Amino acid sequence: DALLNATKDITRANANGAEQFIAVQLTAKEKSCLVAGMPCNADLCEYAAGYYDKLPKALEQLIQQGGVNDQGHIEAVAKQHQVCPFELSLDLATWSDLIIGDYNYIFDPVVRLQRFIAQPNIHLLVDEAHQLSPRVQSMLGVEVTSLEIRAAKSCSNKSMSKSVLSLERAIKKTAKGLAQGEHEIIQTVSLDRAVTKFLENYEHPELVEDREPELEALYFACLGWARGASWFEKKRFRYLVEVKEKSIQVRQICLDAGHYADQVMSEYASTVRFSATVSPLNIYQQLHGQVIHEARFSERARTPFSSVQTHVIIIKDIPTYLQQRPQSLPKICTLLDTLTISKPGRYLLAMPSYAYLEQFRYVYQGRSSGAAQSPEFFYQERGQNAQAQQQLMDAFTAADNVVMAVVLGGGLSESVDFGEAKLSGVVIVGLGLPPPSLERNLMAEFFAAEAGAELGQTMAYNQPAMARVIQAAGRLIRSPEDRGVICLVDPRFERRELQNFFPSYWQPQSIGLNEVKNSVNSYWLHDMKARED
């Protein structure tokens, strides 16, 4: 939404320009479909039938109008001319000055748009660039599961039964002799052969009379697996098999997406990556495959913010290790009471898990703060849908003295802007480290071998954790006029390897809980005097 609004601002600024400015927002086919559940078949869908006959008038209307063509506008014109809105947006994109879309249109090797590949006149603007590496890693990951095979086996016709049974035998072979849990395996030759045979049979029109949904789902899983077998440098991938009581899952995982991301970005004239969370730069350059280009081609924009805008304090005497969390709860309550009494306002509290958040909620709501008027308290619930989250946001922004507890790394702690409802502070409890896993340990081993032992732990565990921390903290300072307090609750934030991820304008102070009152009072008093001057 922020990018779309910025595009509209550009359009308004260009209103008197000599040339018409055209922008288009690409929306996923499933979300833009005007007939829910309708197959993409010209014999069945009125919006697909005769598409290219009806396209010229629809396209002409959009080009003549210019401006920003968001999902709503594209759908309105598509209905008027009875054409598919998704295909219309793609065709309009070739006439547009600016195209807004998800990463997958450029980076996903399966669904990336062929019309935009290797276009030297196109410049990439990559928003939320701290998400680029994990997103591309997920795009390069493929899997086949016994549950998909079993579902297809129960409904497939005779012409496919032999191929499905071969898949079932092959996936069982990958797990032979393995205990329940996740394991690394060296090769998947038997599964690869079974997948190839299944695809050959499925794609042979004489062998398939009726392609049931379960069979189709297995087909796409196998197609992804087959494509993944030929992707890029094998040293950056590993095979994992997870054995459960009633299922087997075989995955090909990507440990390092940087090399592929670099290949994609090099196809275009330039790439600008946007994020407030790209420190230290060498880490993100490594993740994005840009280390080899850094000396000649990379430049970093200077931050528009200054150290006087925020007071960053590390609370060094509230450890948040799992076994110490019960003892931390009353101390976190005291910290919030101190902040809200010193400066009533809106405070965001980010915690590393729902379980920890729920424990805190019971303690916080049951205590007496000692304040004349306690702040309102809202919290993010497990499994909240988008509508419920928006209602929570609306209630939070409407209040003047309020604390909202959210989960670190969730939709309410990243990529959200509170607009005119400015925050007075953000409190981040714990590091939010990813739980140990075989996949992350393999990633740590890979980067340790490639770039040194210290980088392994950093890439696999510290970077994803600190990206979430800095994103949550970034909800506070959104413009040069904003002011506020950031509290990092955990003595581990004193470590140099974690402080390397802090923005350059932060000047953190490490203090105890009993020092917070004087520290924040001094900051707000100094800020008030500076504004008066």
Name what the model sees in each region.
Residues 262-263, 317-352:
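Conserved interdomain hinge at the start of the Helicase C-terminal
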Residues 74-96, 110-116, 204-319, 326-328, ...:
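A contiguous, basic/glycine-rich beta-loop/short-helix subdomain that forms a polymer-engagement track
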Residues 352-381:
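Conserved helicase motor "Helicase C" RecA-like lobe of SF1/SF2 P-loop NTPases
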Residues 442, 452-453, 457, 487-533:
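N-terminal targeting/trafficking signals and adjacent low-complexity tails
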